[in-house]
UniProtKB/Swiss-Prot annotation:
Belongs to the apolipoprotein A1/A4/E family. Secreted in plasma. One of its GO terms (molecular function) is phospholipid binding. Residues 361-380 are annotated as: Disordered. InterPro entries: ApoA_E, Apolipoprotein_A1/A4/E. Residues 1-20 form the signal peptide. It is found in: Secreted. Sequence repeats lie at residues 33-54, 60-81, 82-103, 115-136, 137-158, 159-180, 181-202, 203-224, 225-246, 247-268, 269-286, 287-308, 309-330. Pfam families: Apolipoprotein. GO terms for biological process: acylglycerol homeostasis; cholesterol efflux; cholesterol metabolic process; lipoprotein metabolic process; phospholipid efflux. It comes from Bos taurus. Residues 33-330 are annotated as: 13 X 22 AA approximate tandem repeats. This is Apolipoprotein A-IV. Its main location: secreted. The gene is APOA4.
Amino acid sequence: MFLKAVVLSLALVAVTGAEAEVNADQVATVIWDYFSQLGNNAKKAVEHIQKSELTQQLNTLFQDKLGEVSTYTDDLQKKLVPFATELHERLTKDSEKLKEEIRKELEDLRARLLPHATEVSQKIGDNVRELQQRLGPYAEELRTQVDTQAQQLRRQLTPYVERMEKVMRQNLDQLQASLAPYAEELQATVNQRVEELKGRLTPYADQLQTKIEENVEELRRSLAPYAQDVQGKLNHQLEGLAFQMKKHAEELKAKISAKAEELRQGLVPLVNSVHGSQLGNAEDLQKSLAELSSRLDQQVEDFRRTVGPYGETFNKAMVQQLDTLRQKLGPLAGDVEDHLSFLEKDLRDKVSSFFNTLKEKESQAPALPAQEEMPVPLGG
């Protein structure tokens, strides 16, 4: 049902941002995914159920957060739910209106650019090639980094298994006491190395954001001479393009982080299986160690083969975004359903503004002298 999609959104939020505070992006993701899942099914018969589900999922974001509840968090939770519910209703009402506005905007743009259709198509084609040149090295770098990090992880973990096998052969009488420290150290190393792996791979997606901004700005400059009296409409379309491209970059970052977490979760049971076998006989333990060694290699290799191509896949998606823009601005565009990206961008802007306003109010609440006396909470 609708709830299922929202639960998946919350699961992604948990993987990509385990923070002590709820943030604007998390809330916007839940509202947008909920709106998208509803689609055209927002019938009056289930309106009250849908609202209660949305309220439930937003409240879930505030559960199990670290630290005590602050005045800001408490105020946020009280104000957020009615704000989000109203925003969701507005999304439903504004969708068709915005769809018509975007259709008219593209119609005006195409009419203005039609005399220069060949030049415009050429400029976008040039921009595609520039984008490929910009992003190509990053895709290669990601693949290289994935290979390197996977090899390092394998090299760092294998010695622990080998040491446990050696200890097992030498201490058959006291297996549990002898192997426990090694198993615990292996567990700690798995957690540490996977975090380091994420730390090295996820910045790749952040670098792509900068390249996207540069490329869209160059495209704006190259098309400006052909859209002098419709520049605002062209800018709006390019803002939508940049939003979609950056969204792909954020999704790439989330996928890398999620796959690293999957790797961790895949390795943990293997280490635990050794712990569980310690109370049995040496033969059981030997089998567990053999499986640990084999499965460790397999898990790391699966990660390498899955994540390695992410860069190339991302680059193809970026080229597709530019090709879609070329089609939209071309004389044979036909009907293009792209108003939803603008609707999502507007939603995220509104949620971000809501959070910023609330935080500004909170920051202005304490008396000014209290800022000088940092150890004293309430200006005492």
